[in-house]
């Protein structure tokens, strides 16, 4: 008999059932004699809060209990909203110290015991990669991350980008979640770039920077970080063309406050979320020679925000702005000015602003307002096309900020592919400062 012989199958089943009909009838009568089942409404509700009498931690080995408490923000002998508890669990998991973070409740007199069970992650990660873009050229990327070095709850990051423009950093952080933590970071960075005047190359500038940062950090939720600290810089700038333009190494001292928040859904071709960075710093020149006449102490304020507006499953409208202002701005040190142009944001300078249609660091000043708009469309699987437009002003005097001569307008079209080695992008651009089209290529993640 085949599965397609429907009539034969039905007939055979009916004959088999009739052969044992008396037994089936007795079974049905027996069930019916029990009467109808009583209906019970399921009206139990999950409470929005619970009283925590005590807390138990299971699975902690290398991570301190203080760190986990700082992430969770739960205290015994107090009420806790379950939404707040879930936020704390997400915050702890996002730290990277744990492979899993789970919780449960045990009944207790007057409330419940909160049981936090964790599985700690690997203590170290090593990585290597390669990156190329039109601004920085090719670089070999090296990365190492170690956890719980010297102190529990600490992280040590070692990064290097070895190439034509070398960058390296060593970063040690004692992260205590929503409790104040402590960090120290050393960065070395050298960069060569053209200096432009009226669209033509005027000079080739070389810079070398050594910087040490000491700061205290507070993590708000799992996406926002507040920092207050000090920077010491040992910075050199010179000309590759003019032998008279070589100022040697000079020292700077900079207290700062910064706030950073990142809720992007992914690092490349993001479709939801917001990223914002704010920094207020006071730059003090420490060297007592020609520099005290050339550069003056400067108070620098800057804020940058980029927002994703999902329009449909495949398209996202992106909007952003950068605003930067400087007091005592006539002679601000080079590395603390606002520099505009190019597409790669991977620089040690706080005030770097990518801009369509301008060549790498083509414009610089100490007062600026810039807006950025783009429409990202996912044309097929991991392929994207993104038209972009940027507009804004940059000047050396606040009175000149909105004059026509300081207005910049750039536009471009980017073609991208989200590959396993990182974003691969080709962008063609133009602007009111360059009559010819400018191309930009990016391959892989940047450091």
Give names to the regions the model predicted.
Residues 194-198, 237-242, 290, 329-339, ...:
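Outer-membrane beta-barrel and related beta-rich outer-membrane complex signature
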Residues 23-31, 268, 314-319, 383:
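Flexible, glycine/charged-enriched surface loops at secondary-structure junctions
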Residues 83, 88, 94, 100-102, ...:
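Gram-negative/organellar outer-membrane beta-barrel architecture
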Residues 7-132, 143-145, 157-176, 303-305, ...:
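Periplasmic polypeptide-binding modules associated with outer-membrane biogenesis and secretion
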Residues 125-130, 256-260, 264-379:
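C-terminal outer-membrane beta-barrel translocator/porin domains of Gram-negative envelope proteins
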Residues 128-132, 142, 158-162, 184-190, ...:
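Transmembrane beta-barrel strands of outer-membrane/channel proteins
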Residues 315, 321-322, 327, 404-406, ...:
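Predominantly the C-terminal beta-signal and adjacent terminal strand-loop region
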Residues 374-407:
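C-terminal hydrophobic structural anchor segments
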